[in-house]
């Protein structure tokens, strides 16, 4: 599993997501890779994943298929529910 947040260093909601992303990485350990990409540093990846606003979180299953997407601040409980619905528990 891979969770990527596309954001930016001056984006306030992106900054608010950082502790949640860190908690998710700790909670899922080796079952999921949680990463933060700044769109200014990774514009090609942001375009490839059709990122239109920051932050955008994209979740991929182990086969690389996109299984969830959210734009904006994502409350931890809602984030966990979406991950569980996608199959990551």
Model-derived regions: residue spans:
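Short active-site neighborhood of thiol/selenol oxidoreductases, capturing the structured segment around
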Residues: 1-9
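Thiol-based oxidoreductase modules, predominantly thioredoxin-like and allied folds used
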Residues: 6, 25, 30-43
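Solvent-exposed loop/turn segments at secondary-structure junctions
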Residues: 8-12, 40-44, 65, 73-76
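The canonical Cys-X-X-Cys-His
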Residues: 11-14, 57
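Typically the conserved alpha-helix immediately C-terminal to a functionally engaged Cys/Sec
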Residues: 15-28
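Structural micro-motif
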Residues: 49-58
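Non-catalytic, surface beta->alpha helical segment in thiol-disulfide oxidoreductase systems
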Residues: 61-89
């Amino acid at each position: 599993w891979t969770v990527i947040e596309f954001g930016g260093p001056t984006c306030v909601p992106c900054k608010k997501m950082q502790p949640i992303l860190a908690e998710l990485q700790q909670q899922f350990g080796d079952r999921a890779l949680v990463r933060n990409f700044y769109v200014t540093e990774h514009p090609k990846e942001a375009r490839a994943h059709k990122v239109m606003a920051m932050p955008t979180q994209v979740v991929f299953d182990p086969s690389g298929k996109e299984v969830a997407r959210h734009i904006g601040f994502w409350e931890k409980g809602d984030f966990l529910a979406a991950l569980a619905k996608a199959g990551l528990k």
